[in-house]
């Protein structure tokens, strides 16, 4: 088995699904945003504000290369922009958690939105969502309809890997 990599826009449920998959498959879960935050000593928002998005993306790209060297399979929950990196291919079997923009925004309360610097302006966020959707689909091994909730998404992934 290869790494199972969850991609999708912020708020699509990648972190929650990763935890459930980890339990179901008895695999370690890695979260790229969390790893970067711990290494840098700042939240994702803090990295964006103090070091800039370009530096965050560099950390992300380097982490992808590092994760490719792991010998055992993991569940990898990624940040929403990870699909912008050309080195994502080959990391593992990729699952795109697809959800419409309006549902994503409803799922995120104000406190959650404040943690996500790219959601400060919803008009810009929708444009970003539309641009990234193409990249998510291009990078996906499988597309998961994430509108049905966590259990439904879990069932879909487990069916694909059975």
Curated annotation (Swiss-Prot):
<dbReference type="GO" id="GO:0000287">
    <property type="term" value="F:magnesium ion binding"/>
</dbReference>
<dbReference type="GO" id="GO:0005829">
    <property type="term" value="C:cytosol"/>
</dbReference>
<keyword id="KW-0418">Kinase</keyword>
<feature type="binding site">
    <location>
        <position position="132"/>
    </location>
    <ligand>
        <name>substrate</name>
    </ligand>
</feature>
<keyword id="KW-0067">ATP-binding</keyword>
<dbReference type="GO" id="GO:0009073">
    <property type="term" value="P:aromatic amino acid family biosynthetic process"/>
</dbReference>
<dbReference type="GO" id="GO:0004765">
    <property type="term" value="F:shikimate kinase activity"/>
</dbReference>
<comment type="subunit">
    <text>Monomer.</text>
</comment>
<dbReference type="GO" id="GO:0009423">
    <property type="term" value="P:chorismate biosynthetic process"/>
</dbReference>
<feature type="binding site">
    <location>
        <begin position="11"/>
        <end position="16"/>
    </location>
    <ligand>
        <name>ATP</name>
    </ligand>
</feature>
<dbReference type="InterPro" id="IPR027417">
    <property type="entry name" value="P-loop_NTPase"/>
</dbReference>
<feature type="binding site">
    <location>
        <position position="33"/>
    </location>
    <ligand>
        <name>substrate</name>
    </ligand>
</feature>
<protein>
    <recommendedName>
        <fullName>Shikimate kinase</fullName>
        <ecNumber>2.7.1.71</ecNumber>
    </recommendedName>
</protein>
<feature type="binding site">
    <location>
        <position position="15"/>
    </location>
    <ligand>
        <name>Mg(2+)</name>
    </ligand>
</feature>
<dbReference type="InterPro" id="IPR023000">
    <property type="entry name" value="Shikimate_kinase_CS"/>
</dbReference>
<dbReference type="Pfam" id="PF01202">
    <property type="entry name" value="SKI"/>
</dbReference>
<keyword id="KW-0808">Transferase</keyword>
<keyword id="KW-0028">Amino-acid biosynthesis</keyword>
<keyword id="KW-0963">Cytoplasm</keyword>
<keyword id="KW-0479">Metal-binding</keyword>
<keyword id="KW-0547">Nucleotide-binding</keyword>
<dbReference type="InterPro" id="IPR000623">
    <property type="entry name" value="Shikimate_kinase/TSH1"/>
</dbReference>
<dbReference type="GO" id="GO:0005524">
    <property type="term" value="F:ATP binding"/>
</dbReference>
<comment type="pathway">
    <text>Metabolic intermediate biosynthesis; chorismate biosynthesis; chorismate from D-erythrose 4-phosphate and phosphoenolpyruvate: step 5/7.</text>
</comment>
<comment type="function">
    <text>Catalyzes the specific phosphorylation of the 3-hydroxyl group of shikimic acid using ATP as a cosubstrate.</text>
</comment>
<dbReference type="InterPro" id="IPR031322">
    <property type="entry name" value="Shikimate/glucono_kinase"/>
</dbReference>
<dbReference type="GO" id="GO:0008652">
    <property type="term" value="P:amino acid biosynthetic process"/>
</dbReference>
<feature type="binding site">
    <location>
        <position position="80"/>
    </location>
    <ligand>
        <name>substrate</name>
    </ligand>
</feature>
<keyword id="KW-0460">Magnesium</keyword>
<feature type="binding site">
    <location>
        <position position="57"/>
    </location>
    <ligand>
        <name>substrate</name>
    </ligand>
</feature>
<comment type="similarity">
    <text>Belongs to the shikimate kinase family.</text>
</comment>
<keyword id="KW-0057">Aromatic amino acid biosynthesis</keyword>
<feature type="binding site">
    <location>
        <position position="116"/>
    </location>
    <ligand>
        <name>ATP</name>
    </ligand>
</feature>
């Amino acid at each position: 088995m290869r790494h199972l990599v969850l991609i999708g826009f912020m708020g699509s449920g990648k972190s929650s699904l990763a935890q459930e998959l980890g339990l179901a498959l008895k695999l370690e879960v890695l979260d790229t945003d969390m790893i970067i935050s711990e290494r840098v000593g700042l939240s994702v928002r803090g990295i964006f504000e103090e070091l800039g998005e370009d530096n965050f993306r560099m950390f992300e790209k380097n982490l992808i290369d590092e994760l490719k060297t792991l010998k055992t399979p993991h569940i990898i929950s990624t940040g929403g922009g990870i699909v912008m990196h050309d080195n994502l291919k080959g990391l593992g079997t990729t699952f795109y958690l697809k959800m419409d923009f309006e549902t994503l925004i409803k799922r995120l309360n104000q406190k959650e939105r404040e943690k996500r610097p790219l959601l400060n302006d919803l008009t810009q966020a929708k444009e970003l969502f539309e641009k990234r959707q193409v990249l998510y689909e291009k990078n996906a091994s499988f597309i998961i309809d994430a509108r049905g909730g966590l259990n439904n998404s879990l069932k879909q992934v487990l069916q694909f890997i059975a």
